[in-house]
Amino acid sequence: MCSRGVGRTTEQGIRIGRAGERERIRGRVRAVIGQLEGILRDLKEVAKELKEVVEQIDRLTSDFEFELDTDDWTPGTVSSTSSSEKGGPLCDLGPLDFLSSDSWEFCSFLEASTPSDSGDGSDRPPDFRLLNGGVTPNGPDSSSEEIPIAQQKPPPSKNSGSRDRVRFSDKVLYHALCCDDSEDPPYGQETPRDPPRATAPCAVMKSKPGGLTGVRKGTRNCSTQTVCDKSTQTVLPYVPKKGKDKL
């Protein structure tokens, strides 16, 4: 019996604890709801104050006239009104109704609408003498103070008939006979050209009783000669030994 009574009391205590927790949660929720209601009331009061401020601004600005004529419109007013109205219809602006402040068409319109500075209205062409670096005026009374143009002197012309003589010296002849590339000939002197080589006659080679074996160009074996010797000496015809004995 005692155990049953103890079990009942514990169950009742648990129920009471759960009920207390629920009451606490409900109290917190009610408090939050009350705070939200207070915030909504404050917002409503702020909205009323804003309406009153707007009405006062309308009363103060009712005496001002903000309507402008079409001639007074500028690109700034056009852009401001278009941004404020968010794409609303604009009034008739004449030639500016299709232009914007950042378009090339507006720039061309301004260039076409600007009047010319000259009184007669005729466009004077630019002075090409100033552009090409000609005589530059130095003020309003600079007719006498003009910068002279530097005249270019023509280069001295040489006579076609006259020709410099080439004087040959021992040094030039030495260079003609011996190749020495370390030293260049002096300025104004020309090295003599190689004399034309004599054409060597063709020697006919005879063979045993059979006839001609072939035609051979007679040249002298000059394997020990230098390049300069070959260029300066004439080529001697080749004569076989039999021919030398007969001579």
Swiss-Prot record:
GO terms for biological process: inhibitory postsynaptic potential. The lineage of its organism: Eukaryota, Metazoa, Chordata, Craniata, Vertebrata. It is found in: Postsynaptic density. GO terms for cellular component: postsynaptic density. Residues 76-85 have a biased composition (Polar residues). Residues 69-90, 112-166, 180-217 are annotated as: Disordered. May be a component of the protein machinery at the inhibitory synapses, probably acting as a scaffold. Keywords: Coiled coil, Synapse. Disulfide bonds: none annotated. Belongs to the INSYN1 family. InterPro entries: Largen/INSYN1 (IPR027997). This is Inhibitory synaptic factor 1. The keyword Coiled coil applies.
